[in-house]
């Protein structure tokens, strides 16, 4: 029999207990990457310089990476073409296999060996529209691989409900309805709350890139610039009700380039991101972002760049490194290309698919399209070989590109 004996609980004991609890809480918070003034720091409070690659075309296919010049460009357009060519049942099976094969554990191992320390994962809202959605299964697997290799994961909402850009990249209807549709805004908030709830305790997930490249440079759409930061505030407030651990990443208007839409920072754990393509590779193109960092004492990050020659990539990377700006080049992997860390061969009969894809679309042109279809066996062979070519063991390393990033090239495959 146990006898409970009441003991006096002194004030000093209470204070000691509080000290232990707060120390534990602080230790838990420090396990996550977070901001510290103009720097990003890791869980041990050491400065963290991000050197990353974008896993583009995995969960949000883009037409140019299939060489569909003049053809389908958005995910839905590419999926419609696939369905038209191989039918709905085979198309559904194809895309499931695509998502299982395009990025694998071998790829994350290679990314680690090449010297990267982070990946940005562009996602489509449709894959995260329920707690048991396919996207969570795929991303959970990626997080597991990344945790093993010490690769930080940044989740990027590339395709938001309603569309934040109004072009192919957000899979919209050709207009950024997100900024004028209350339903789309509520849906986007719900997507981020679901993601935050799922990953709130996962330290290898570095942060959430809330909207990719909102509002293009088209003059007619710049009316929405004034709505961007208020919507970011709504997203942040909603996410912070669930997850106070992760960095919130905010991109400017006009393809993430215009920081004039921002006032003083409204979240104590936020980083600001910009994208730069086809510019001079010197410090003049990032000066306004450096000034923003100095003015508000917040970290900045290049979330996308690339699609250029090795010489340009090398020069721009040096500029970023010299100015202590973390970076993430686009993309990791492309078909028949030199402007990515790895590439894969063009599938058999793919030129026939590209030629067909360039025809004028729509059921009003069905007769002409049906007449121009490649032979059924060639179509099937092309899509089968595409799944074969994207496999990890069929990829080729672009050593010159990896070297241009200042990283150690992987062994040739």
Stretches found by the model and what they are:
Residues 32-33, 89, 186-335, 339-355:
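Extracellular glycoside hydrolase catalytic/binding regions
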Residues 1-29:
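Bacterial Sec-dependent N-terminal signal peptides
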Residues 35-50, 54-247, 252-260:
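Active-site mouth of glycoside hydrolases
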Residues 21-23, 166, 219, 314:
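Alpha-helical transmembrane segments and their juxtamembrane interfaces
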Residues 11-14, 78-79, 91, 379-383, ...:
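Short amphipathic alpha-helical segments that mediate assembly, nucleic-acid/protein binding
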Residues 4, 9-10, 42-44, 292, ...:
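A general structural signal for short secondary-structure junctions and capping/turn motifs
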Residues 312-413:
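Aromatic-rich peripheral "rim/lid" segments of glycoside hydrolase catalytic domains that contact
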């Amino acid at each position: 029999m146990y006898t409970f004996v009441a003991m006096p609980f002194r004030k000093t004991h209470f204070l000691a207990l509080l000290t232990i609890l707060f120390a534990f809480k602080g230790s838990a918070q420090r396990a996550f990457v977070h901001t510290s003034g103009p720097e990003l720091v890791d869980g041990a409070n050491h400065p963290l310089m991000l050197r990353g690659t974008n896993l583009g075309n995995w969960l949000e296919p883009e037409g140019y990476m299939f060489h569909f010049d003049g053809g389908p460009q958005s995910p839905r357009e590419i999926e419609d073409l696939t369905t038209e060519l191989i039918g709905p049942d085979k198309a559904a099976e194809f895309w499931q296999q695509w998502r299982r094969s395009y990025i694998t554990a071998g790829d994350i191992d290679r990314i680690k060996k090449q010297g990267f320390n982070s990946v940005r994962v562009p996602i489509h809202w449709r894959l995260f529209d329920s707690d048991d959605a396919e996207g969570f299964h795929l991303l959970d697997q990626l997080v597991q691989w990344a945790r093993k290799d010490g690769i930080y994961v940044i989740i990027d909402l590339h395709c938001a409900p309603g569309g934040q850009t109004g072009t192919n990249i957000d899979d919209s209807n050709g207009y950024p309805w997100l900024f004028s549709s209350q339903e789309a805004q509520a849906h986007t908030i719900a997507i981020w709350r679901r993601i935050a709830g799922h990953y709130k305790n996962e330290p290898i997930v570095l942060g959430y890139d809330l909207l990719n490249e909102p509002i293009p440079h088209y003059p007619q759409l710049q009316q929405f610039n004034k709505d961007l930061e208020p919507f970011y505030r709504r997203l942040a407030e909603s996410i912070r009700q669930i997850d106070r651990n992760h960095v919130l990443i905010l991109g400017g208007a006009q393809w993430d380039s215009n920081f004039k839409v921002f006032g003083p920072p409204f979240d104590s754990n936020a980083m600001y991101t910009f994208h730069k393509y086809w510019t001079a590779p010197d410090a003049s193109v990032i000066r306004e972002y450096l000034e923003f960092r100095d003015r508000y004492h917040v970290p900045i990050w290049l979330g996308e760049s690339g699609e250029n020659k090795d010489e340009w990539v090398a020069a721009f990377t040096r500029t970023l490194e010299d100015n202590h700006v973390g970076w993430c080049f686009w993309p990791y992997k492309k078909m028949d290309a030199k402007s990515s860390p790895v590439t894969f061969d063009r599938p058999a009969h793919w030129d026939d698919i590209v030629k067909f894809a360039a025809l004028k679309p729509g059921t009003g042109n069905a007769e002409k399209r049906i007449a121009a279809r490649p032979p059924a066996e060639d179509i099937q062979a092309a899509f089968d070989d595409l799944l074969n070519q994207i496999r990890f063991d069929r990829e080729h390393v672009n050593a010159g590109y990896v070297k241009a990033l200042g990283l150690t090239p992987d062994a040739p495959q």
